[in-house]
């Protein structure tokens, strides 16, 4: 039997589609359905690594976790990773395919559509329900001829579509009614209901708004979802950072340098969730003044990021910075003595001196390592802590001085190994490694924070599963009757 598809469409980018798909995946799973997320094409430098070493969008991997299944490439067959200068690396079925500009990508849409349908068919064959996510708006009329992620997917599977608007940004009537108006008649017939997301205050105050939307659209408003203050799920892309430091709070301050083509910045979400910790994304050295630590995150363009740091004045500022300095993946490469790209892996290639804060050198190769990994910490604040995360990089880094590894990798994919990774300075102040997800380990994260002078205070009660918390929030707004109607389970 082929699984039916529910599709969450949005009136624009960042209206909450990804989070709502996450919630629906958990709600479906709670009701006994074998459910899987799907997004035909995603644009983000936040990638996750599947068990077989493939890349998919981090947001889709989070949705799979909500569905309580392993993420696979069928859930996100095309991933677009922007590299700057209007070019992007295209990841197809979890493997880097080629780097294209927008026009080249557009010309290959029909070939990519075959990949989309093949993977969606495979996913539907092994599930009870697929919950698909659109991208941006389904009525970008100048782009619609090349659509492989919104209404073309909906038409292909006859999806039951839900259209979501963000009332917090204003213009909810124009968002929802305008989008419906611009859909083709056969597309509009697929839309089964509307959702109003991110309402601040008492939803009862929007009862007139619900009536107006239903009268003018002829569709039910399935729910008015209140603003969710305690959403502890990764943001999808750097748009979230451009909205400001929404995770910041009073207390110990950690600065994250917002590098060009920043990638996998959800590495630092566990830090921001700790009480008494402020996480601040910065672009200027002056913003380091009250920080006790600074983190250099991953980036799709390490050499370009190196030049950017020099131009912004970070070289001098980081050498004078008295606190802890950390690099993850590309950030680790930046902390070293030299970065070389003889094959032009990152574009034009070249050779740059690093920041000179760790005695390591990096050389890029054509082979990309994407793998889940287990490791053991050698850091003085968390000796022996068992870590789990993933590696995703094309550079290879070696120590050129006394070898002081930060971690020992014990498993890469299915292979047992014993390999050192990363480096830590003699005084423990500067360190870096390739392992994404290192801060998700409680012992490592809290040990490092206490090393910086953090005092956790009274131990908080263990929080509920964030997916259950989110699902409960959405179900309360929609109602059980509507949830079961949406899933067609009576």
From Swiss-Prot:
Active site residues according to the UniProt entry: 329, 436
Disulfide bond entries: none
Domain GATase cobBQ-type: 251-444
Role, per record: Catalyzes amidations at positions B, D, E, and G on adenosylcobyrinic A,C-diamide. NH(2) groups are provided by glutamine, and one molecule of ATP is hydrogenolyzed for each amidation.
Signal peptide from the UniProt entry: none
CDD domains found in the cross-reference section: CobQ_N, GATase1_CobQ
GO MF terms, alphabetically ordered: ABC-type vitamin B12 transporter activity; catalytic activity
UniProt keyword Methyltransferase, yes or no: no
Protein name as catalogued: Cobyric acid synthase
GO terms classed as biological process: cobalamin biosynthetic process
Classification via InterPro entries: Class_I_gatase-like, CobQ/CobB/MinD/ParA_Nub-bd_dom, CobQ_GATase1, CobQ_N, CobQ_synth, GATase_3, P-loop_NTPase
Family as reported in the entry's similarity comment: Belongs to the CobB/CobQ family. CobQ subfamily.
UniProt organism field: Roseiflexus castenholzii (strain DSM 13941 / HLO8)
Alphabetic keyword roster: Cobalamin biosynthesis, Glutamine amidotransferase
